[in-house]
């Protein structure tokens, strides 16, 4: 039986609270909370929020990790007509204060201890939230978030300048959710049993909670204290009865460090959903060997177009024949185009910027008309967004990814994709992980390419000097990389800096190299 689209997220959650009140919606390492609990707790908290007399539709910050109270608070806020701004409890203090400065929330709900002391915004802490749950207040839903109202606001991790708050409406969310639960590429089962690992402040989290709540399934969450400790992580993962794994490819790479991460130990896993960064052929091949019968979905899209706009099930033929995986068939309600530098549509097969339009495109950045005007526009009568990604559309309707426009450089007359260089470096038998970074001269021209490299275990001991390692890597890659793409300098590190979302912070490294 195929899944039906939903008309309203809260009505759908209410429906499951009536039809399957004792079915688990949230499982934190074995501690279960049911759909009945979620309704009762969110109703009771929504009643308390209404009594506070906050300005209508004003946004509320919710600070915490993967606790059940986070989800119940989100639902309570949606019922009471407020957008929520999730901030992960592991966020840097500067980031937290920068978000508060931009958002000016009417309330902070701190499920984890709030790290800033001097805050003028009213605050509710975990004990008060639990007290509100215990009151068991009834609640009549009269003014929920609906239509073009903001459902959530997620701040992207800008490495420089102030963070940008992407406003996602209820309509935007429905466009994404209904595509995901009805699309044949995802093939999402009803009552999905879903891993809930990415933090709520990262919009990849919407890829697990939205379809799960829309289809009456269960979220299995891993607190971040566990995901950051290999031993605990592996012990916990094997105990979770999950069928769908949703994460960045990097998190799957981390899981594959354990030889036990395979279909024999985890026979329940039937689907892998990837988004948030590029899924490489190497990672997908390794995963296919470990889970030969699982469906591996490569999805793509910016936060500004609600999580993802395209997806494809990776085939064995793709793994055998392609150097780079396609990023998917685009969703029907979101016309996606490739345009040239003048803004003209390009025919299939030609490379340009990926433009997405339609009902999933955000209304823009919160209180930032300048940045909104730069990125958002109207295209053929529909709201549209400049992704800043380079792509090509095939005649079959498959989108191919060509890297970030801001990670494209001109060097000695050649146009070079930094991501291409990084991918090729990662093919060396000596390299665990590597990224390429340009160094600019005073005329803003690329002077040379540098490689930041993490070596595989045991490699350093095989060589006397770094220069010998570099020579061996270059020889190793002679047949793979064009000479003009080969970095002139290799810097060896034990780790590479990550953004708050767990991606390698390439912009930060570029700034470091160029002392910006």
UniProtKB/Swiss-Prot annotation:
Residues annotated for ATP binding in this entry: 156-157, 298-303, 389, 401-404, 503
Cross-referenced Gene3D superfamilies: 3.30.300.30, N-terminal domain of ligase-like
Origin: domain of life: Bacteria
CDD domains per UniProt: DltA
Subcellular location(s) per record: Cytoplasm
Record GO cellular component, one term: cytoplasm
Residues bound to D-alanine: 203, 307, 503
UniProt protein name: D-alanine--D-alanyl carrier protein ligase
């Amino acid at each position: 039986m195929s899944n039906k689209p939903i008309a309203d997220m809260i009505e759908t959650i209410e429906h499951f609270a009536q039809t399957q009140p004792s079915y688990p919606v949230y499982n934190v390492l074995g501690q279960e909370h049911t759909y009945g609990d979620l309704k009762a707790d969110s109703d009771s908290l929504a009643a308390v929020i209404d009594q506070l007399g906050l300005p209508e539709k004003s946004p509320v910050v919710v600070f915490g990790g993967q606790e059940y109270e986070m989800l119940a608070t989100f639902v309570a806020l949606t019922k009471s007509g407020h957008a929520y701004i999730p901030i992960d409890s592991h966020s840097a203090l500067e980031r937290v204060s920068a978000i508060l400065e931009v958002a000016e929330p009417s309330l902070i709900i701190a499920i984890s201890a709030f790290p800033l002391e001097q805050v003028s915004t009213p605050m509710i802490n975990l004990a008060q939230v639990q007290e509100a749950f215990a009151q068991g207040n009834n609640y009549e839903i009269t003014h929920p978030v609906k239509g073009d109202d903001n459902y959530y606001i997620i701040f992207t991790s800008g490495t420089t300048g102030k963070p940008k708050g992407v406003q996602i409406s209820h309509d935007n969310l429905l466009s994404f959710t209904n595509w995901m639960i009805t699309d044949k590429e995802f093939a999402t089962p009803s009552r999905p049993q879903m891993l809930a690992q990415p933090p709520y402040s990262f919009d990849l989290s919407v890829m697990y909670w939205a379809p799960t709540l829309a289809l009456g399934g269960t979220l299995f969450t891993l607190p971040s204290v566990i995901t950051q400790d290999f031993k605990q992580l592996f012990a916990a993962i094997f105990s979770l009865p999950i069928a769908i794994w949703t994460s960045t490819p990097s998190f799957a790479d981390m899981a594959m460090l354990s030889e036990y991460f395979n279909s024999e130990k985890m026979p329940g896993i039937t689907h892998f959903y990837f988004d948030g960064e590029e899924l490489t052929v190497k990672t997908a091949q390794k995963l296919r060997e470990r889970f030969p019968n699982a469906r591996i979905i490569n999805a793509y899209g910016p936060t500004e177009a609600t999580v993802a706009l395209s997806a494809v099930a990776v085939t064995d033929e793709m793994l055998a024949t392609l150097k780079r995986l396609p990023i998917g068939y685009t969703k029907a309600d979101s016309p996606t185009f490739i345009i040239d530098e003048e803004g003209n549509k390009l025919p299939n097969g030609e490379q340009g910027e990926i433009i997405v339009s339609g009902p999933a495109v955000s209304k823009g950045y919160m209180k930032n008309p300048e940045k909104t005007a730069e990125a958002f526009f109207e295209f053929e009568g529909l709201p549209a967004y400049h992704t800043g990604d380079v792509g090509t559309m095939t005649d079959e309707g498959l989108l191919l990814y060509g890297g970030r426009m801001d990670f494209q450089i001109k060097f000695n007359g050649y146009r070079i994709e930094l991501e291409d260089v990084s991918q090729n470096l990662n093919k060396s038998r000596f390299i665990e992980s590597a990224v390429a970074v340009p160094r600019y001269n005073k005329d803003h021209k690329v002077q040379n390419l540098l490689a930041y490299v993490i070596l595989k275990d045991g490699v350093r001991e095989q060589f006397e000097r770094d220069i010998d390692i570099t020579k061996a890597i270059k020889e190793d890659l002679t047949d793979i990389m064009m000479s003009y793409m080969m970095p002139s300098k290799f810097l060896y590190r034990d780790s590479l800096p990550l953004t708050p979302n767990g991606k390698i912070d390439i912009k930060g490294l570029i700034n470091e190299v160029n002392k910006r």
